[in-house]
């Protein structure tokens, strides 16, 4: 079973997170940051994974530590659940429209961490979520999952739609990448290792 559970406690956050790559329930997100909960729920649904998150953070400061640390723990849990990555597609790409917005995510579960992020948000906050944290979350996720992740808003105006498009596209690209392909024997790399 491709699953993992991680608990991480620091001076700033206390996080319990569990993933299962081969089942879609439960999905239960509690971070104290409403918009972020909404985005993580979308991410889980579109990647078709089970994801539970309980996070307590220093929200009296702002939501930065909570969002970034959830990205760290989610990346670590996904990496652990993937194991040696034998048989997976490895690559995934998705374009997701959201009304006037079109977002793209393309990723490689290569073991090499990199993020290319091309998105601007006119609205600095969505609820108690600072829109600059979209990039911070994906940076933490990419570096801890050890994936190469390219995110881009091709066009759009609404900040909510832009963020939602990127979270959905990343979820859908991840589903493609983590899917076990019967035509792939061993690891999908000429190196024999990811």
UniProtKB/Swiss-Prot annotation:
- Can you tell which superkingdom this protein's organism belongs to? Bacteria
Which Gene Ontology terms describe the biological processes this protein takes part in?
L-histidine biosynthetic process
Matches recorded under InterPro entries: IGPD_sf, ImidazoleglycerolP_deHydtase, ImidazoleglycerP_deHydtase_CS, Ribosomal_Su5_D2-typ_SF
Q: What is its main location?
A: cytoplasm
Catalytic activity, EC: 4.2.1.19
Annotated localization: Cytoplasm
GO MF entries: imidazoleglycerol-phosphate dehydratase activity
Per UniProt, the keywords (alphabetical) are:
Amino-acid biosynthesis, Cytoplasm, Histidine biosynthesis, Lyase
Describe the reaction catalysed, as an equation. D-erythro-1-(imidazol-4-yl)glycerol 3-phosphate = 3-(imidazol-4-yl)-2-oxopropyl phosphate + H2O
**Top-level enzyme category:** lyase
Gene Ontology cellular component list? cytoplasm
Q: In which pathway does it act?
A: Amino-acid biosynthesis; L-histidine biosynthesis; L-histidine from 5-phospho-alpha-D-ribose 1-diphosphate: step 6/9
Pfam families per UniProt: IGPD
Against NCBIfam families, the record matches this protein to: PRK00951.1-2, PRK00951.2-1, PRK00951.2-4
Per the record, the similarity remark reads: Belongs to the imidazoleglycerol-phosphate dehydratase family.
Among PANTHER family, the record links this protein to: IMIDAZOLEGLYCEROL-PHOSPHATE DEHYDRATASE, IMIDAZOLEGLYCEROL-PHOSPHATE DEHYDRATASE HIS7
* Full protein name: Imidazoleglycerol-phosphate dehydratase
Q: What is the lineage of its organism?
A: Bacteria, Bacillati, Bacillota, Bacilli, Lactobacillales
Q: Which gene encodes it?
A: hisB
């Amino acid at each position: 079973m491709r699953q993992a559970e991680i608990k991480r406690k620091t001076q700033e956050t206390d996080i319990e997170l569990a993933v299962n790559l081969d089942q879609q329930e439960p999905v239960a997100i509690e971070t104290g940051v409403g918009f972020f909960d909404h985005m993580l729920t979308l991410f889980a649904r579109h990647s078709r994974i089970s994801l539970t998150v309980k996070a307590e953070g220093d929200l009296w400061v702002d939501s930065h530590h909570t969002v970034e640390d959830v990205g760290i723990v989610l990346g670590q849990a996904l990496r652990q659940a993937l194991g040696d990555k034998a048989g997976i597609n490895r690559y995934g790409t998705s374009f997701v429209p959201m009304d006037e917005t079109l977002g793209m995510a393309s990723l490689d579960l290569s073991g090499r961490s990199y993020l290319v992020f091309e998105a601007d948000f006119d609205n600095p906050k969505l609820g108690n979520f600072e829109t600059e944290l979209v990039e911070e979350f994906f940076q933490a996720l990419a570096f801890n999952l050890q994936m190469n992740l390219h995110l881009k808003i091709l066009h759009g105006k609404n900040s909510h739609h832009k963020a939602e498009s990127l979270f959905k596209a990343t979820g859908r690209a991840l589903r493609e990448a983590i899917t076990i392909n019967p035509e792939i024997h061993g690891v999908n790399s000429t190196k024999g290792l990811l």
